[in-house]
């Protein structure tokens, strides 16, 4: 027997019994962005490697260790996208969507990072993101946080996530702070772990994000970024907090919060949860006013966020919030004998036209009554329709409830759609 081919490590199938919770999540995401008037953008999975080197930064873990990069037959270096923001900016620049315009966009799709697979984190993962361009004021920062908050409300996760916010200031303020932080870290260099020493000069703000408790203790005495902010950055952050207070979104200021990508400035935020064990991030983002210019466009203010859908699915399943996801089938149509199959197909088609949104499956493959009802029950359908010679002769169809103890009933064919509508 030929050797069975397996999926690549860290790249998982989403099987039919798993799809309903994904479909529920995706429907919530689409409803939320529609409620805020955002437009969808779709970009290629494969991009020029330079796009991510210029946006994410060459000395980040993503570019150095995690990207899937290869040369095509023309010798061009290409990369499977590790995140969605850079591709969205590239598309906006290329098609003239960003300069002197306001754009509220969203995207979803697979991303790729070669990191150690673990529960909720995979080498191919699905990301949902929101990006807004052309608005520099703090009110749009508040809006994207309102949108993210709506997602938790619709998913029943509000009590299980916490919003953390911080400000990184502008590039000049951050540069001054960077110098002060490096000077502080140099004093304690011998006590830093290998990862912090590696980042100390290339990306010192990332040292603040360490999970090492010994380094965290050292950083307790580090200079505070807030002390290096000018009035404009302080005012921006203050306005954001006022707007969050006004709409009742609770948050905590985390002065150690930085983002893993180099392009962020001013507002940064994360929604975190401890419902998956150790505290973990389930949604993150912030403002990145310099990235559009960095990638060849005109300087354009921008803010956005992204979330990994595998983490959200895991959270829903862990909290047992995925149990109310409906079955894939509402009505299962059976035929008692080959002579009834044409009528069963015709009735199923009539119902699909009369009841849009109701999921109707027709039994195929023959079999006796017991086998067909067993299949109907296994499908998860609420109702089985029984099409038999005697019923057809009377112009009727039998409806058998499968999820309660209600009795089977005979219904005239012309009243079938309305009866089903009332029952499911």
UniProtKB/Swiss-Prot annotation:
One of its GO terms (biological process) is histidyl-tRNA aminoacylation. GO terms for molecular function: ATP binding; histidine-tRNA ligase activity. Its main location: cytoplasm. GO terms for cellular component: cytoplasm. InterPro entries: aa-tRNA-synth_II, aa-tRNA-synth_II/BPL/LPL, Anticodon-bd, Anticodon-bd_dom_sf, His-tRNA-ligase, HisRS-like_core, HisRS/HisZ, HisRS_anticodon. Keywords: Aminoacyl-tRNA synthetase, ATP-binding, Cytoplasm, Ligase, Nucleotide-binding, Protein biosynthesis. It comes from the Bacteria. The keyword RNA-binding does not apply. The keyword Transmembrane does not apply. It is found in: Cytoplasm. Homodimer. This is Histidine--tRNA ligase. It comes from Shewanella amazonensis (strain ATCC BAA-1098 / SB2B).
């Amino acid at each position: 027997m030929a050797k069975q081919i397996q999926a690549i490590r860290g790249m998982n199938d989403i099987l039919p019994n798993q799809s309903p919770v994904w479909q529920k999540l995706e429907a919530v995401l689409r409803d939320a962005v529609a409620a805020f008037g955002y437009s969808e953008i779709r970009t290629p999975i494969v991009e020029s490697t330079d796009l991510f080197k210029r946006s994410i930064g060459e000395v980040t873990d993503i570019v150095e260790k995690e990207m899937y990069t290869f040369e095509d037959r023309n010798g061009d270096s290409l990369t499977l996208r590790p995140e969605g923001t850079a591709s969205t900016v590239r598309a906006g620049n290329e098609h003239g969507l960003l300069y002197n315009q306001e754009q509220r966009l969203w995207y979803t799709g697979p991303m790729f990072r070669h990191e150690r697979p673990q529960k909720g984190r995979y080498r191919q993962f699905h990301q949902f993101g929101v990006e807004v361009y052309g608005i520099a004021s703090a009110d749009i920062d508040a809006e994207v946080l309102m949108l993210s908050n709506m997602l938790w409300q619709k998913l029943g996760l509000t009590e299980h996530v916490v919003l953390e916010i911080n400000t990184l200031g502008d590039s000049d303020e951050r540069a001054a702070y960077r110098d002060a932080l490096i000077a502080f870290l140099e004093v304690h260099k011998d006590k830093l772990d290998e990862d912090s020493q590696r980042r100390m000069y290339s990306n010192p703000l990332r040292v603040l994000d360490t999970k090492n408790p010994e380094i965290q203790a050292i950083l307790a005495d580090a200079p505070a970024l807030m002390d290096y902010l000018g009035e404009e950055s302080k005012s921006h952050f203050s306005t954001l907090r006022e707007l969050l207070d006004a709409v009742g979104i609770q948050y905590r200021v985390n002065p150690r919060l930085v983002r893993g990508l180099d392009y962020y400035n001013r507002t940064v935020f994360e929604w975190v949860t401890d419902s998956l064990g150790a505290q973990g991030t389930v949604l993150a983002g912030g403002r990145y006013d310099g990235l559009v210019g960095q990638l060849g466009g005109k300087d354009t203010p921008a803010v956005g966020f992204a979330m990994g859908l595998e983490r959200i699915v895991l959270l829903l399943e862990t909290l047992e919030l995925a149990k109310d996801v409906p079955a894939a089938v509402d009505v299962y149509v059976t035929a008692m004998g080959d002579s009834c199959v044409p009528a069963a197909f015709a009735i199923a088609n009539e119902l699909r036209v009369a009841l849009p949104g109701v999921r109707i499956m027709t039994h195929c493959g023959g079999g006796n009554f017991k086998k067909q009802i067993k299949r109907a029950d296994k499908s998860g359908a609420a109702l089985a329709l029984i099409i038999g010679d005697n019923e057809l002769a009377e112009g009727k169809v039998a409806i058998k409830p499968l999820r309660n103890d209600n009795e089977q009933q005979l219904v005239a064919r012309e009243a079938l759609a309305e009866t089903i509508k009332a029952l499911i």
